[in-house]
Amino acid sequence: MAPAMEEIRQAQRAEGPAAVLAIGTSTPPNALYQADYPDYYFRITKSEHLTELKEKFKRMCDKSMIKKRYMYLTEEILKENPNICAFMAPSLDARQDIVVTEVPKLAKEAAARAIKEWGHPKSRITHLIFCTTSGIDMPGADYQLTRLLGLRPSVNRFMLYQQGCFAGGTVLRLAKDLAENNAGARVLVVCSEITAVTFRGPSESHLDSLVGQALFGDGAAAIIVGSDPDSATERPLFQLVSASQTILPESEGAIDGHLREIGLTFHLLKDVPGLISKNIQKCLLDAFKPLGVHDWNSIFWIAHPGGPAILDQVEIKLGLKAEKLAASRNVLAEYGNMSSACVLFILDEMRRRSAEAGQATTGEGLEWGVLFGFGPGLTVETIVLRSVPIAGAE
């Protein structure tokens, strides 16, 4: 019996490593420019009398390195829901009504773009991983997206709620395991984030909440992951070489979020950038030891841009050249911090800028790369990537 069982297990598994086969992104149409945002935010929350706090918020926005963000919440929606604009008003029902509907809708746009780039019928999707920080409901956003896209009822679904900013790495780790352990699997991975649950008015006694109001934006990203790609019809973008998760030492309470009647509250300690930069070298050494890589300027970088201070301190700690974090900084500038969706936007940015610059590979001409997710815990996801040659590149 044992040999037959081994043969069955072998047949169930893919032969090669998982790869990203397509990427799609989407944002709400409502763009908010960071230079104008303090005036807008204090006006819409009826907080213009807090002049000193407004000046602090302006400085936060100026230092954020963000040019614009996209938000589902328009001025009209906020005027219709004044409790969302308060700091401590019961408003969870109104917030839930928005995100339960809009998170899957935004996800559908990104997923449709990824499926179109992939070029295969959606009936070939075997698994769906859906991640969002907001809008817990039953049946969940994974079910709603299955219905919106018209996926097969037998698609195997996984739903991740309220993981936070590290979860763009989590979904890649799960997708890798699914693709490599199920021959022929094609995994649709979607992160969809809408700030309607975290938006709230300012408070002089809670400046950490104000930091979140200066950074977060809305966006959805989708990827298709599979092993053993069809060389005639599928074009891999990146291979997923390894994936790991760790909780950083002495970091408990550094980033917290709590779902309450007033919405999803956000708490942030000042030393988050320091905690990440202090521990990132060990994460890299553990991940790249099997490859014999220890020059962090010889790899391409996709780092979750929680804020500019995190990127700055990582850059200094590791002695990275300025261009190493350019893709991460550009996504932060153009979209803000979109929580779990951010690293997938950066993955898209990386392959596009590599092609436009005539680079030899999808990873800025380099072979190996790293994707980092940072978030509550402090939790770090470390994904080792391998780029692929760009067709027609010199």
From Swiss-Prot:
The keyword Transferase applies. Transmembrane segments: none annotated. GO terms for molecular function: naringenin-chalcone synthase activity. CDD domains: CHS_like. It is an enzyme of class 2 (transferase). Pfam families: Chal_sti_synt_C (PF02797), Chal_sti_synt_N (PF00195). Keywords: Acyltransferase, Flavonoid biosynthesis, Transferase. The primary product of this enzyme is 4,2',4',6'-tetrahydroxychalcone (also termed naringenin-chalcone or chalcone) which can under specific conditions spontaneously isomerize into naringenin. Belongs to the thiolase-like superfamily. Chalcone/stilbene synthases family. This is Chalcone synthase 8. It comes from Bromheadia finlaysoniana. The gene is CHS8.
